Amino acid sequence: MCLLSFSWNQHPEYKLILVANRDEYFDRPTKGLHQWDNGIYAGKDLKGGGTWLGFHPNGKFAALTNFRDPKNDKPLSRTRGELVTGFLNGDLSPKAYLSQLEKIKQDYNGFNLLVAEKEEL
């Protein structure tokens, strides 16, 4: 099970304090935290091409946890890692991005997505 715990705007020095783990299949290929060519900082899922957690120097942050629901599994679903990179690389605010995502969420298997930008979470 993936876990994510955070504190937002509660510390005088740090806007975001985050503790997270990625509980994925051990044989799923990944690359550790690094700066991508497009400027974001994140690990990379080498199978799906996306990420589960990342930030952009412009102040954007996104994190994803998956949840498995065998009764509603979609074998041909889109990779959930693109949800994080889509927000980080896009121009939409967190609220606008989630509103847009509402229209296509059925294309993905189960997930929880946290997005933030400077003052908006």
Describe the function of each predicted region.
Residues 1-121:
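N-terminal nucleophile
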